Amino acid sequence: MSLMTKLGLRTLVASCLIAVGGAAHAQLNVLVTGVGSTQFPIATANFANEANSPQQVSTIVRQDLQRSGKFTNIDAGSTPVAETDSVDLGSWKAKGANAFVSGSVNRLPNGQYEVRFKLYDTVKGESLGGLVLVSPESGLRMSAHKVADYIYAKLMGGRGVFATRLSYVIKTGGRYQLQISDSDGQDAHIALSSPEPIISPAWSPDGTKVAYVSFEKKKPIVYIHDLPTGRRVVVSDQKGNNSAPAWSPDGRTLAVALSRTGNTQIFAVNADGSGLRRLTQGSSIDTEPCFSPDGQSIYFTSDRGGQPQIYKMSAQGENAGAAQRVTFTGSYNTSPRVSPDGKQLAYISRVGGGFKLYIQDLQGNTATGLTDTTHDESPSFAANGQYILYATQVNGRGVLAAVSTDGRTRQVLSVQGGSVREPSWGPFMQ
């Protein structure tokens, strides 16, 4: 069986594991392991007036911080504290909190909601600022995620990814659904529903579009789906298989895997479907392309050495220079994804008959396994490079999971009674 057939069958079988009736609701269940004393203690008070709000903003903030694995929540009691209230920072420090958050949620005359908050450093006894966020009711959860991102940035020194989105595929009642949700799996909505499989969703760099492969016409075709409008464009409908779309960092080009010439090869195509050009040359199976963050290189899976391994070539194709092998740990490595800073490579390695998520330092080439599961697939880096989202199985059921790049923090995103696969973590919101 060819490499492309193996990879394709594994993807399709995984996404067809369980068919269920009724609605599927994503719920993030968090297991934080191995962090210990490295967690930052923070107290987030209930926000003033949020009891009358359709969303409990402070609760969402606490949940975001907890699931990051970098914070531990100190009990702030049930009394609401507004951002304008006087705060005894010494008392909160005595309770073990190194930071304190207060805020309010108010409905404006025009029906929108205003979230205000203030962050304090209790150790230094000073304010670390805050924000005023205005949104419609439907945007309140995202406002809460932005509060958590602000806190993360101020206390951790890097950008948070709470206000980002996920895409994934759920099969329910004989239909496949491409769903878009918040980073915690909540506020999910269906972008596409089809009786045929949907695979390989990939976010555009600006977060407004998702490319994917749909079998709705009884063959794999690559589409670009504009999320705000719902408009779709066919990017590749060539003879044979059209698969594995990957965006260039500038959003102008996609790399795709096509079998139009026989064996699957990697091509580049403009985002409007024009300008198709072949990038890999030869008789091997080349698939699963992924651009480097600077857009100068493409990583991909190839069996040119006999077994699937990950290679790197110029984004201009092999005519600009022969591809170089990247992975040397293990005899079967697939599904490359490069971290946003270009320093790490996530991929799936076959280990003892199972498939596990690995991460490799691209400078030192050291490879490390990150999971204890054996059905891992489809890795996707968070926009800040601190976490990797992937699909796996727990108790025989397809779930999504996220793990920190040091392997210490793990999260599981499961669908009650159903199976969820094909994850992709979206970029920072514009």
UniProtKB/Swiss-Prot annotation:
GO terms for cellular component: periplasmic space. Keywords: Cell cycle, Cell division, Periplasm, Signal. InterPro entries: 6-blade_b-propeller_TolB-like, PD40, Tol-Pal_TolB, TolB_N. Residues 1-26 form the signal peptide. It comes from the Bacteria. It is found in: Periplasm. Disulfide bonds: none annotated. GO terms for biological process: cell division; protein import. Gene3D superfamilies: TolB, C-terminal domain, TolB, N-terminal domain. NCBIfam families: propeller_TolB. Belongs to the TolB family. The Tol-Pal system is composed of five core proteins: the inner membrane proteins TolA, TolQ and TolR, the periplasmic protein TolB and the outer membrane protein Pal. They form a network linking the inner and outer membranes and the peptidoglycan layer. Part of the Tol-Pal system, which plays a role in outer membrane invagination during cell division and is important for maintaining outer membrane integrity. This is Tol-Pal system protein TolB. It comes from Paraburkholderia phytofirmans (strain DSM 17436 / LMG 22146 / PsJN) (Burkholderia phytofirmans).
